Amino acid sequence: CCSALCSRYHCLPCC
C-alpha cells in the first residue's frame, strides 16, 4: 500500500 489512509480500507497502487 502506498498510503496509510488507503491501506485502512484497501491496498491500492497509490492514492
Curated annotation (Swiss-Prot):
Tissue specificity remark: Expressed by the venom duct.
Modification note: Has a free C-terminus.
Alphabetical UniProt keywords: Acetylcholine receptor inhibiting toxin, Amidation, Disulfide bond, Neurotoxin, Postsynaptic neurotoxin, Secreted, Toxin
GO cellular component, as recorded: extracellular region; host cell postsynaptic membrane
One of the record's GO molecular function terms: toxin activity
Main location: secreted
Keyword Disulfide bond: yes
Subcellular location: Secreted
Bridged cysteine pairs (disulfide): C1-C15, C2-C11, C6-C14
Family from the record: Belongs to the conotoxin M superfamily.
Biological function: Slowly and reversibly inhibits human nicotinic acetylcholine receptors (nAChR) alpha-7/CHRNA7 (IC(50)=45.7 uM). It is unknown whether it inhibits nAChRs by a competitive or a non-competitive mechanism.
Domains as described in the record: The cysteine framework is III (CC-C-C-CC).
Miscellaneous field: Has low or no effect on human alpha-3-beta-2/CHRNA3-CHRNB2 and alpha-7-beta-2/CHRNA7-CHRNB2 nAChR.
Protein name: Conotoxin ArchIIIA
